Amino acid sequence: MSVAANAELMDYDDVIARFDPVLGLEVHVELSTVTKMFCGCTTAFGAEPNTQVCPVCLGLPGSLPVLNQAAVESAIRIGLALNCEIVPWCRFARKNYFYPDMPKNYQISQYDEPIAINGYLEAPLDDGTTWRVDIERAHMEEDTGKLTHIGSETGRIHGATTSLIDYNRAGVPLIEIVTKPIVGAGERAPQIARAYVTALRDLLRALGVSDVRMDQGSMRCDANVSLKPIGTAEFGTRTETKNVNSLKSVEVAVRYEMQRQAAVLASGGRITQETRHFHEAGYTSPGRVKETAEDYRYFPEPDLEPVAPSRELVERLRLTIPELPWLSRKRIQQEWGVSDEVMRDLVNAGAVDLVIETVKHGAPSEQARAWWGNFLVQKANEANIGLDELNISPAQVAAVIALVDEGKLSNKLARQVVEGVLAGEGEPDQVMNARGLELVRDDSVTQAAVDEALAANPDVAEKIRGGKIAAAGAIVGAVMKATRGQADAARVRELVLAACGQG
C-alpha cells in the first residue's frame, strides 16, 4: 500500500531503535443470532434500509428491551474459548452520547461489569512461534446504525452534503473483545496485531458464533497505538484507529501509526489522544478528540436485570467448545505430512479449511492442496479477492480432481475446466463436455495423429529409430498440439516409440 504524499514518517528501523510500541486492540464482533440483542427484529444482512426495525431499536418512548438469551450464551462460549473467567454476575450500562447512529441517544453496553474477564489467546506468527495476547475483557453490547455520507470525496461526514441513516444494524448483538496492553513486541508489533486478529477470527469462525466478515462489518478492529522511549516505563499518549476492515490493514495501520507518532515525537511535538481513520491507501487521518469514560456518563441500565449465568450453564457450554483452530491445524499437518513452511503458506492463503472440505468430498489431500494452494490462489490474487470468495466450491474442485484421476482430463485441461467453472459455465463435467476438453482415449485416433506427425517430421523419426529416444519429445509435442492437448501425453510417447521400433 502507498501512503499519503505529505505524510511525515520516521524510517521503521529508526522507530524500533528509539521507541517501544504499546498496542491495545479492540475487536467488535457481530453475533450470528437470528434476532437482535434486545428485540425480535431479524439480523439478516443486506435488507432494504430501515426495514428491520421496531420501537425498541428505534428508541421510541415506552419501548422496553428484552435480553436475547442466545447472545448471552454466545458471549459465554467466546469467553471460555479465550480462556476467560466467566463472572457469576454482570450487568448492562447506558453509554450516553448524542449522534444520529443511535436514536435513543445511548447505547446499551457493559462498562465495569463485563461477562468475561482475564483471558488470553496464543496468536501463531509467520515464523512458526506464537505470541500470547492477554485479554482484559469481553463484553456484550448492541451495534449502532450505519451512516452513509453523500457528497464528500472521502465518504466521511466532512464535506458531505447529505447523510443517510440505516437503522437495520442498530441493536444487532455485539461482543467487544479488549486486550490488555501488548508490550515488548518491538519490530514485530504490526505482525503480532495482524496475527492476533487472524487467530481471533479463526477461533470465532470455529465456534460458529459469527461469520466474521470484515468486508461486511461483522468484525471490526480498533487499533490503539502509543510509543514510549526505549528504557522508560511510562506509556505514551495513544491514538485509536477505528474500524480497520481487513487483516492486512490492521498490520499496515499499526506500522503507519508507529512511524507517524515517532516522527512527531522526534520533532518535539506531542501526540494528541484522538481517534483516527484508516484509508485504503495505507495511511491514517485525524478523526475526533478521543472521549474518556466520564464523557459517556455511564450508569446501570434500569430496564434490564443483571445477568447471572449459572455454573451449570457455563459447564454445559464449555462442552460445546470445539478443537481450537491452531491445534486442529497442527493435527492436520501431521496427517498430511507437510512441512511448517507449506502449512504456513496454506494458512496465510486461507486454504486449509477449503482443502479439508475438498478431502471430505473424496479428493486426495495432496491434490486438494495443490489446487487450492497454487492455481486457485493465483486466480484469487488476480481477482483481488479472498480464496473463499472464488466462484468454485470444494465439491467442484473434488469433481475436477476425480475427472483427472479417471483419465478424462489432463492437469492442463483440468485448469481450463476450472476456469470455466469460475466463469459460471456450470459444473466441471458440463464445462468439460461443452468445451470439448475430454482426453482422447481412442488409440486409433491417437495413432493416426502420431503417424501424421512422424510423416511430417522424417528427420526426427529417423533419429528416434537410430536410438535417440529424447527426440521423441518433439513428436509428442506435435501430437499434443494437433489434438489441442486432449491426447494422453504418456500414451502418445508409448505409441511414438513403438512406431519407431523402440517400444
From Swiss-Prot:
One of its GO terms (biological process) is translation. Disulfide bonds: none annotated. This is Aspartyl/glutamyl-tRNA(Asn/Gln) amidotransferase subunit B. Allows the formation of correctly charged Asn-tRNA(Asn) or Gln-tRNA(Gln) through the transamidation of misacylated Asp-tRNA(Asn) or Glu-tRNA(Gln) in organisms which lack either or both of asparaginyl-tRNA or glutaminyl-tRNA synthetases. The reaction takes place in the presence of glutamine and ATP through an activated phospho-Asp-tRNA(Asn) or phospho-Glu-tRNA(Gln). The lineage of its organism: Bacteria, Bacillati, Actinomycetota, Actinomycetes, Mycobacteriales. HAMAP family: GatB (MF_00121). It is an enzyme of class 6 (ligase). It comes from Mycolicibacterium paratuberculosis (strain ATCC BAA-968 / K-10). Belongs to the GatB/GatE family. GatB subfamily. GO terms for molecular function: asparaginyl-tRNA synthase (glutamine-hydrolyzing) activity; ATP binding; glutaminyl-tRNA synthase (glutamine-hydrolyzing) activity. Its EC number is 6.3.5.-. Heterotrimer of A, B and C subunits. It catalyses: L-glutamyl-tRNA(Gln) + L-glutamine + ATP + H2O = L-glutaminyl-tRNA(Gln) + L-glutamate + ADP + phosphate + H(+); L-aspartyl-tRNA(Asn) + L-glutamine + ATP + H2O = L-asparaginyl-tRNA(Asn) + L-glutamate + ADP + phosphate + 2 H(+). InterPro entries: Asn/Gln-tRNA_amidoTrfase_suB/E, Asn/Gln-tRNA_Trfase_suB/E_cat, Asn/Gln_amidotransferase, Asn/Gln_tRNA_amidoTrase-B-like, GatB, GatB_Yqey_C_2, Gln-tRNA_amidoTrfase_suB_CS, Gln_synth/guanido_kin_cat_dom. Keywords: ATP-binding, Ligase, Nucleotide-binding, Protein biosynthesis.
